Amino acid sequence: DLLVTESRLFITNLLWGEDPDLRALFDAPYTYLNDALARFYGVPGVDGPNFRKVALDPNQRAGILTQGAVMAATAKANMTSPVFRGQYVRERVLCTPLPPPPPNIPVVPPSPDPNSSTREKFEEHDRNPACAGCHKLMDPVGYGFENFDAVGRWRTEENGHPIDASC
C-alpha cells in the first residue's frame, strides 16, 4: 500500500538515513512520494513509480502525524473522526491515558445532517454534560487534523463549509 510505504520510508530515513534525526518525526517538512501518491495528495512535480524525498508545503503537512497512513488509521471509512484522532495523539503520542466512557453512557452518533461539517456534528459532545468531561480532552486535539480528509488528503472545506481546524 502506498500510504504504508510512505511512512516506512520516512521512518527508515529518520532512524538510519544520511542525517538521522528522530526529532523530525513530528515536524519534517518532507515525505517520500512516487507519482501515484503525489497525485493522490495533489503534490505536483513528481514523476515515475520510484519513491523519493519530496518537500511539502509546511503550512499543510509536517511529520508522521499528517501522513495518509496515520490519518486513515485514525478515521472512519467515510469520514474523519476528531475523537479517534484526538484519542490517538493523547494516548499514543503524549502517553496520556484517557478514562473509558462510563458504562451507563450510550455512544451518541454524530448528527446525521449531511450538510454540516464533521466538527459541527461532533461539537454535540461539548454541549452534552454526560459527554463533555471526557471529550474535552480529545476532541479539540482531533479538530486540529480536520484539514485532512478520512484518507489524509488536504482540504479547506467540507460540505460547502470552510474547515475550522482550531483546537
Regions found by a protein language model. Give the residues of each.
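Amphipathic alpha-helical substructures
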Residues: 1-54, 108-122
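Sequence context surrounding c-type heme c attachment/ligation sites in exported
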Residues: 38, 52-167
